[in-house]
Amino acid sequence: MKKLQVIIEKAWDDRSMLKDAKTKAAIRKIIKLLDAGEIRVAEPDKKGNWIVNQWIKKAVVLYFPIQQMKTIEVGPFEFHDKIPLKKKYKKLGVRVVPHAIARHGAFLAPGVIMMPSYVNLGAYVDSGTMVDTWATVGSCAQIGKNVHLSGGVGIGGVLEPLQATPTIIEDNCFIGSRCIVVEGVRVGKEAVLGANVVLTQSTHIIDVTGKKPKTFKGEVPPLSLIHI
């Protein structure tokens, strides 16, 4: 793995290396590992702190320029894109309702349910989670176990504009209809966001349960109920 990291870091600093077959193979290997859930762009340590593997995120960014546009035919439907679609859902134990789409490079754990929705590459969606109708999971976003992303939810990615930290939704969260969570905001375990809540790094999240109000930015504490 260290050898792959060295290649990615060098290619990030010198984009001319993207023409090299060895570099392309390394990038595609990383995407394949992401697709299988063997590596992650971000992961919690034993204390619950999230560690971002920046070099893996860089590999996701570098994947686009080495890919060629191709026509993808799925029954009567046709797409034209650089990134292949994820496949073999039955083997993965994932329920996918037409017209849900996940890209190659996104990990979906067994028990995930995708209603007509979209999961971008580099994302990690853990077991028991439902991605409801018209919800979108952005590039490299990290979604925990038994999460419900309600209809029309938007979980931001890291690619456009390029973000330092992926958006994180921890285990057992409920994200209400039409919520937007972007810019690397972290939603702690078992938190509930009411419908239409919008969270960015500059959003003031005010805890009024104590004697004095307490303000958070960029993170939602575990077990919180957030509403507008």
Predicted regions and their residues:
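Terminal amphipathic alpha-helical/low-complexity segments used for targeting or macromolecular assembly
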Residues: 1-95, 217, 223-225
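Structural signal for interior beta-strand "rungs" in well-ordered beta-sheet cores
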Residues: 94-226
